[in-house]
């Protein structure tokens, strides 16, 4: 790999930091500054911003530094730290999206009568979020698989590449695929799918008034953007990781894993734009 590729990665990470930090920090600041935004639902949105800041400060800065050097210069400890923060931040963000999807489904579709999303429910959602994220990020630190430099050796991730006797890589990869990708994806599709159906049913029952038509358009737009952003960010990375895992021993170019891994990092920019900037109250407070 020539030096221009590493320079490109370094510039890309700098761009993510340049955009990701202020957008997520502004999200935190505005929500904490304005009392009307401190609602139970926004606790989850704040958690999303915290997760993105974890990725920016704990992962992106390290990756930019190592990209500038052309390899991972920070040793085993640095690899563990970078891999942990990147994985934890990504998983917190992912499970925040799941909690948001479940909350929206319960509120809009009303499968539980007279349910009101309270501060206690939000705290429970945050606790569940951190438990699931930690269940993914901590095992490689304690011997269940491990974090290793991947792709162009500028960032670290869980070892999909080898079986590594004694580290049980296979079981962790299967756990990650099922528990930390397929199940969240199913939940998100289910919740927003049911939400869209509920809006359509309400529109039909009310003979499609202007209000319900507008609500349907807003929900549809939110569903499409949410699903596309999730798939765009994570499906390439998950697919390539699974392909490499299923073809261990084969030769793969360093760019093969680098591109989807670095592309997935762009989720730190998409999240606040979708879940905060599309909220008119948050947007007005920011202005």
Swiss-Prot record:
Alphabetized InterPro entries for the sequence: GPCR_opsins (IPR050125), GPCR_Rhodpsn (IPR000276), GPCR_Rhodpsn_7TM (IPR017452), Opsin (IPR001760), Retinal_BS (IPR027430), Rhodopsin (IPR000732)
Topological domains, Extracellular: 1-5, 66-79, 143-171, 244-255
Annotated TM spans: 6-30, 43-65, 80-102, 122-142, 172-193, 222-243, 256-277
Posttranslational modification: Phosphorylated on some or all of the serine and threonine residues present in the C-terminal region.
Stretches of the chain forming a coiled coil according to its record: none
Gene Ontology CC annotation, any one: photoreceptor disc membrane
N6-(retinylidene)lysine sites (modified residues): 265
Annotated protein name in UniProt: Rhodopsin
